Amino acid sequence: NNAVWVDWIQQVATAHWSNVASDEHQARYIWVVTRHEIDYRGNVGPGETVTAETFIPRGPTGARFDRRVDFRDAAGKVIVSANTTWAMLERESGRLARVREDVTAPFRPFADEG
């Protein structure tokens, strides 16, 4: 169901941030979703598995950073694609924070950079 896919999208994004971002940045910033755009091209049944792949399609705009998550079935076919927009907040103040180069560096190259 739709809510399950949204939960998986958030889990994948969170895992990517946790595994790539520095400890300092993880302690200083949090992310909130401002937009989900999800395309459904297939479904999975009970007992079937999917594989998720995530990447950053382009650099940030101010406090916002887009992310793409594709889910593939066992045959490798993309069955769900999601484009999500995240906003970065300063953990202490809860205020929007411009996404700086040192925050983005570990996630490069972006898809639009070849």
PLM feature segments, named:
Residues 34-41, 52-53, 66:
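Short structured motifs
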Residues 1-35, 89-114:
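Hot-dog-fold acyl-thioester-processing enzymes
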